[in-house]
């Protein structure tokens, strides 16, 4: 099944303006998001602020919206943590792979093969779920992967 993966628009962390947990979009990121379009049956969205705001500021239309931590970013940098999380505990590659397997299991339980699906997520998650078959996505970049 071909699935669309969208990396969030430019965040404050991406622009090197700050190092804070669960950071917001920049003005440029809001502009990038406003250029995004598409029509999807179902959208899976990471619960991180930058992915939610990317979807909020976009012109993407959808039927069902599912928020899940299963497609959030690999916890490495300060921005990859929610406010209540300990940023000294990083996620390993093996832990990310296990989370991807859990996401795929959950994903397949929610969709049917004929549906047009979008996953709004993050650089490392998208790169890993695509098995590194494409370059890591840039901010607000859409990639299509076979799931």
How would you describe each model-predicted region?
Residues 1-2, 28, 67, 71-87, ...:
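Acidic, low-complexity terminal tails and accessory targeting/binding regions
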Residues 2-67, 89, 137-143:
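Active-site-proximal alpha-helix that buttresses catalytic centers in soluble enzyme cores
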Residues 2-7, 114-125:
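Beta-strand elements within well-structured catalytic alpha/beta cores of enzymes
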Residues 18-24, 57-105:
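Phosphate-handling substructures
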Residues 29, 33, 100, 104, ...:
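Short amphipathic alpha-helical/adjacent loop interface patches that line ligand
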Residues 38-39, 107-115:
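Glycine-rich phosphate-binding loop signature in dinucleotide/nucleotide-binding domains
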Residues 46-49, 70, 119-124:
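Short, well-ordered beta-to-alpha junction loops that form the rim of enzyme active sites
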Residues 52, 56, 126-131:
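Short, hydrophobic alpha-helix immediately C-terminal to the catalytic nucleophile
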